[in-house]
Amino acid sequence: MKKINVITLGCSKNTVDSEHLMARLAAAGYEVLFDSDRTDAKVVVINTCGFIGDAKQESIDMILRAAAAKQAGKIERLFVVGCLSERYADELRAEIPEVDDYFGARTWDGIVRALGASEDPALATERRLTTPKHYAYLKISEGCNWKCGYCAIPLIRGAHVSVPMEELEEEARKLAGQGVRELMVIAQDTTYYGIDLYGRRMLAELLRRLCRIDGIEWIRLHYAYPAGFPDEVIEAMASEPKICKYLDIPFQHISDAQLASMHRRHTKAEACLLYTSDAADEED
């Protein structure tokens, strides 16, 4: 059985992408590893980050390390996927030709075909978990519609695309069946969830549905954009014991002038109103 090592760099969204890829590779007969300290597998896939300077450098360093291992005969095939290669594919091909091929953050079918893995849609909700067994990330959407002045995510990941609720419920059930007890709900902007599919923000409804899944005991919300934050989410947190009283919100700044220069879509007053919402006060 041929070993393949999937090295994941960057954020938790990348982790989910890698876990889906690993499930398809395992179904194709690969022995799948996920160890960033090893470059001795016959095939290596590096899932990169291209967001900030330090992350880009970390990705480049890992690619160069693996390329050197390939030149030394330790690796037979080397592939690079993810945000860095989505953003800089031409430059990377020119500078690091040892890589067999580069695939972006939106071309997962390409790497699946290159490695002979299954393209069966039924595997779309399968995961080879790399997190501690009691929790897993649940990515509810891809991309972002906001155009913040400092952020390249819309360029890299494209427009916001929500995953249908039924698919997320099925994925959560499978995760619960694998022993997962806590869901970390993630996206580029979790609070925007549903607008493209249902015509309105549906995060609160999704959270309530996830609460009904047997085996899931805690649900923790991450990447909640403050602009347009739905009051229904606070109400769901107050009434549903499985939803952790926790919010990961990137306020970024509290100066209206600075927020405007960053092209953020909320003000100081709106941020303060969210922080002091009636539902939150009632829960306290």
Model-derived segments and their meaning:
Residues 189-193, 217, 226-229, 242-268:
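Conserved radical SAM core fold
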Residues 60-63, 199-205, 267:
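Charged helix-capping and loop-helix junction motifs
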Residues 1-193, 232, 243, 247, ...:
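Proteins enriched for Cys/Gly/acidic motifs involved in redox and nucleic-acid/cofactor modification
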Residues 50, 157-158, 197-200, 260-266:
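Short glycine-enriched, charge-decorated loop/helix-capping segments at active-site entrances
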Residues 275-280:
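Conserved small/polar residues in nucleotide/adenosyl-binding loops
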Residues 197-199, 230-240:
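Distinct, well-ordered alpha-helical segments
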